[in-house]
C-alpha cells in the first residue's frame, strides 16, 4: 500500500469537484520525469477507462486515487492538502521523494547523504536559484560538495555551508560524517544570488 496522505479538506475538495464530473470519475496522482531534478507532481481527473491494471488504487470516502506503478515509489510520503487563507484557496502537493527515490536506512552512506541533499537541502537552495551536488565522501568522513546555479559566487555560500548544510548533515549522520567541505571555484557573476 502507498504512503500518500490526502487531508480531509483535500478529500472534501476532490469530492466536490468529482461531483460535477461524469459518474465513475476519480483522481490520478502522478509524477512527470520522476527521479530527476525536473520532476513535477500533479493531480488530474481519472475516468474509468483510463485506469490501468498496474495502477495502485487508494480508496477514500466517495472516490479513489489512482497512481501508476512508475510514479508510486516517488510519491512515498507525499501529502496533498487544500489550504484556505486571506489570499484564497489552493491545493498543495508536497512530494519529498519525487526527485529521488527514498533510500533505506541501511543503504551506503553516499546514497543516504545524496538523498538528504536532494530532498532536504536543495529544495531550500532552489528559492535562490541554487543547488548543491555531492562530489564524494572521503575516507575521513568528509562530504565534499559543489555549489551551482545562484549559489556559485554568492557571498553567503560560507554561511550556507557551515550554518545550513554542514549542521544539517552532521546532525543526521552522527558518527558517519565529520565535516562538509566546498569544492566549488566561486566566480562571482550575474548568476550569483548575493
Curated annotation (Swiss-Prot):
Cofactor(s) listed: [4Fe-4S] cluster
This protein's record includes keyword Metal-binding: yes
Domain of life: Bacteria
One example GO MF annotation: 4 iron, 4 sulfur cluster binding
One GO BP annotation of this record: protein maturation
Keywords, ordered alphabetically: 4Fe-4S, Iron, Iron-sulfur, Metal-binding
Disulfide bonds: none
SUPFAM superfamilies in UniProt: Fe-S cluster assembly (FSCA) domain-like (SSF117916), HesB-like domain (SSF89360)
Listed InterPro entries: Fe/S_biogenesis_protein_NfuA (IPR017726), FeS_biogenesis (IPR000361), FSCA_dom_sf (IPR034904), HesB-like_dom_sf (IPR035903), NIF_FeS_clus_asmbl_NifU_C (IPR001075)
Known partners and oligomeric status: Homodimer.
Function: Involved in iron-sulfur cluster biogenesis. Binds a 4Fe-4S cluster, can transfer this cluster to apoproteins, and thereby intervenes in the maturation of Fe/S proteins. Could also act as a scaffold/chaperone for damaged Fe/S proteins.
UniProt protein name: Fe/S biogenesis protein NfuA
Species the sequence originates in: Vibrio parahaemolyticus serotype O3:K6 (strain RIMD 2210633)
Lineage: Bacteria, Pseudomonadati, Pseudomonadota, Gammaproteobacteria, Vibrionales
Amino acid at each position: 500500500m502507498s504512503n500518500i496522505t490526502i487531508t480531509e479538506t483535500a478529500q472534501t475538495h476532490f469530492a466536490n469537484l468529482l461531483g460535477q464530473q461524469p459518474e465513475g470519475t476519480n483522481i490520478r496522482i502522478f509524477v512527470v520525469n520522476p527521479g530527476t531534478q525536473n520532476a513535477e507532481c500533479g493531480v488530474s481527473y481519472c475516468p474509468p477507462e483510463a485506469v490501468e491494471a498496474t495502477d495502485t488504487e487508494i480508496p477514500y470516502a466517495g472516490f479513489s486515487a489512482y497512481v501508476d506503478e512508475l510514479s508510486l515509489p516517488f510519491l512515498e510520503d507525499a501529502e496533498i492538502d487544500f489550504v484556505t487563507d486571506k489570499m484564497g484557496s489552493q491545493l498543495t502537493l508536497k512530494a519529498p521523494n519525487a526527485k529521488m527515490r527514498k533510500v533505506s536506512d541501511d543503504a551506503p552512506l553516499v546514497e543516504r547523504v545524496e538523498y538528504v541533499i536532494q530532498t532536504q537541502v536543495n529544495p531550500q537552495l532552489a528559492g535562490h536559484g541554487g543547488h548543491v551536488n555531492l562530489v564524494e565522501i572521503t575516507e575521513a568522513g568528509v562530504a565534499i560538495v559543489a555549489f551551482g546555479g545562484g549559489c556559485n559566487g554568492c557571498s553567503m555560500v560560507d554561511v550556507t555551508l557551515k550554518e545550513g548544510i554542514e549542521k544539517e548533515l552532521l546532525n543526521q549522520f552522527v558518527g558517519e560524517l565529520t565535516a562538509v567541505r566546498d569544492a566549488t571555484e566561486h566566480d562571482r557573476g550575474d548568476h550569483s544570488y548575493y
